[in-house]
Amino acid sequence: MAWRNRRGALRAILSGSACVRPASVYDAISIRIADDLGFPLGMFGGSVASLAILGDPDIALITLTELAEQMRRMARAAALPVLVDADHGYGNALNVRRTVQELEAAGAAGLTIEDTLLPQAYGEASPQLISREEGLGKIKAALDARLDPSLVIVGRTGACAITSLDDAIDRAVAYQAAGVDALFFTGVKTRPQLDAIAAATTLPIVLGSPPAELTDWDYLAAQRVRIAVQGHAPIAAATEAVSKALSALRDGAAPKQLTGLASAELIDRVTRASLVEERGAQFLGLKRE
């Protein structure tokens, strides 16, 4: 039931009239902070998953098991609904079925399946797409695999940047006809491109990291853009903070000399320390301080 409530919250965003900018989340701490700050939605991107879990770039090295386990940790840590970037579904259409089942069980509110050819093909320096037919097969497999009908399935295409706008629209129309809940486009750069996409489709739209020309949120909302992913600055900020702290310590600074550290109050809030103390009093007979 808890998962269904989160999925209902994501569906409410998609059926609403506003353009939401989700928080980029990647672990228990980041999702709790996002939830506490009042974000309505979290986005668990493939690139941040690879960085947070493996310390690797976004080149499809992460496994489905690793992705699902991290999603499970986040779902346990906070009630914020999360849209998961499930990349290519970790294989063919049959692998996509397994991907949907694992992420559904892990507590994802929704997931995206894309048509990028992953991992990168031998001898190909630039990104490639799978065929429209193979992409459609993956989408149909994803829809068939979900046990909870409230789980959101988003069809994603990178055709705008790789092949053409017409190809992107053709693929999106096919995914829409198959029954996806929303359409995710990457590589959209201009208003005329977005206008054409909105005119050719009827489903809610998700945009990946829109450029400056596409940051008028009222305009985006009018074009049925319900989610605009705004990159993954939090993990970049965290990486920089860790690098600076360790660099200072290596150079001889005392821990108390460091600046920019989380306060004790923030740590207590993020770790839910007062709730743990309350449970200790309730179940272990411990006195609260």
Curated annotation (Swiss-Prot):
InterPro entries: ICL/PEPM, Oxaloacetate_deCOase_bac, Pyrv/PenolPyrv_kinase-like_dom, Pyrv_kinase-like_dom_sf
Catalytic activity field: oxaloacetate + H(+) = pyruvate + CO2
Record keywords, A-Z: Decarboxylase, Lyase, Magnesium, Metal-binding
Cofactor(s) required for function per UniProt: Mg(2+)
CDD domains named in the record: ICL_PEPM
Residues that bind Mg(2+): D85
Organism of origin: Rhodopseudomonas palustris (strain BisB5)
This protein's name: Oxaloacetate decarboxylase
Lineage: Bacteria, Pseudomonadati, Pseudomonadota, Alphaproteobacteria, Hyphomicrobiales
Catalytic activity, EC: 4.1.1.112
Gene3D superfamilies the UniProt entry points to: Phosphoenolpyruvate-binding domains (3.20.20.60)
TM regions (residue ranges): none
Chain residues that bind substrate: S47, R156, H232
Biological function: Catalyzes the decarboxylation of oxaloacetate into pyruvate. Seems to play a role in maintaining cellular concentrations of bicarbonate and pyruvate.
Pfam families in UniProt: PEP_mutase (PF13714)
Example of a GO MF term: oxaloacetate decarboxylase activity
Database matches in SUPFAM superfamilies: Phosphoenolpyruvate/pyruvate domain (SSF51621)
Subunit record text: Homotetramer; dimer of dimers.
Family named by the database record: Belongs to the isocitrate lyase/PEP mutase superfamily. Oxaloacetate decarboxylase family.
Bound cofactor: record note: Binds 1 Mg(2+) ion per subunit.
